[in-house]
Amino acid sequence: MKRLVKCLCMILALSFCLAIPVAAEETTPYGSSYFGSRDAYLWRTSSTSCEAWFEITAVRGMAELGAQFIEIEESADGVNWSVVATYNRANYSNLIKTNTSDHTSYVTYSKMKPNYQYRMYVRLYAKDSSGNIATSSMYGYFAN
């Protein structure tokens, strides 16, 4: 009887060990092993306009590198945000650079209102020579 209990305990212990879920995925910075560093920020140029800047560095040369799009958002209360402008790569060729490992660019927004807060949302983009694509998104705020 003692031997049976030991055997059952061993089987039960083994089944618990094998039933524990284990996460085994690799985590890379910025959601992609393509991106080395990245930054996004707004730069006020007047009381009614600002520049939305992004800087991106890839870990190696890319066929295409930059931003798929940039959105400018505004808020009267700092809680509820609305998109007031969208700049995409199809209409703004400066957002993507080819055959490079780094890219810095900006777009200008010129309809800022007094007493409103502004931020930018950017979707960064990298495409290697094999056609593999990686994206990473981030918000940017006023640097000045």
Identify the meaning behind each predicted range.
Residues 2-24:
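Sec-dependent N-terminal signal peptides of Gram-positive bacterial secreted proteins and lipoproteins
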Residues 20-144:
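Low-complexity, Ser/Thr/Pro-rich intrinsically disordered linker/stalk segments at domain junctions
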